[in-house]
Amino acid sequence: PHAALSSQSRGRQTEEAPCSVRTCYQRDRDRIIHSKSFRRLKYKTQVLLLPEGDHYRTRLTHTLEVSQIARTISRALLLNEDLTEAIALGHDLGHTPFGHMGEKVLDSLAKEHGLGGFHHAAQSLRVVDHLEKDGKGLNLTWEVRMGIIQHSKGQVDVRSGFGLAEPSTLEAWVVRISDSVAYLNHDLDDALRAGIVSDPDIPESVIKKMGASHAQRINSLIMDIIENSEESRPTFSPSMLASIETLRGFLYGSVYRHANAQIEDSRVEHVLAALFRYRVEKCKDDPQ
C-alpha cells in the first residue's frame, strides 16, 4: 500500500507522451543504463584507488550490487521495484574518480575557488538534468531525481533545490540503506583480497551477527532489513545497527586509514588539484 505508483508520478520537468509498453520509471531506468555517464562508472575506483587485478570493485560494480540488493528488499516489501532500480542505477552517476577521497579533494578545491563545494549526490542530479545528451539532460521523473539527490546522508548543496530533506519515497529509503549494505561488504571483501586485512582480523561480534562469508553477511543484512522495516521507512534492528557500527569502525581503522591508502590519497590530491587548476585557467582564457 505504500509503494510509489508510476500512474501517480509527479511527472517530468518537460512533459512527454507516455510509452505504450513501459512505465515512466522503467523508461528512466533504461535512459540511465544507456547514458554515457553510466558507462564511465567502470573507470572509477572504490576503496583501492589503484588496484592491481580484475576482481576489485569499481563504481560500476558497486552500482550494480546496490541495484540487486535494493531490488530484493523492494520486492519483499511490496514496493515499486522499477523505481527502486532506477534510483539505484543513477545514484552515483556524479561520483568522482578515486572514491570518496576524490570527492573530499574536489569539495575543498571548489570551496577554495568560491564555488560552494562539491557533493556527489548533487553532481549526480546535475548529470541527469544538465550534462547528459549534450546538455539536454535525461528528463527523468521527479521521484527518480529526488531519490538520486537524497540517497546520501552527507551534506547536499542546497543549490540543487532539494536541500537536506530525507528520502521522499520508501523506494529511495531502500536505495539509501542498500548502498550501506553494499559498500560495507564489498569494501571488506576487497580489503581481504588485497591482503590489507585477513579473516582473523574481523571482529568476532561481526562474524557472530552477520556471518563468516561475504554471501552470509549480505544475506543477514538484507533479511534483517526485511524483517524489521517499519511502515515509515526501511531500517535495521538495534542489534544489527550495533554490529554495523563495529564493522564500520573496523574498516575505518584497518582499511581506509591503512598506510597504503594514505599514500594513494596524497597522489589523488596532487592529480586532482593539478587537473582542477588547469580547467580553472582554461575557463579564464575561454569562458565558453
What residue ranges belong to the model's regions?
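Histidine-centered, transition-metal-coordinating active-site segments
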Residues: 1-63, 67-73, 80-81, 102, ...
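Short coil/turn residues that cap or connect secondary-structure elements
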Residues: 33, 78, 94-97
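Active-site alpha-helix of zinc metalloproteases
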Residues: 86-87
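Short active-site segment of divalent metal-dependent hydrolases/proteases
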Residues: 90, 94-98, 182
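A glycine- and small-aliphatic-rich helix-loop capping segment at beta-alpha/alpha-beta transitions
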Residues: 99-112
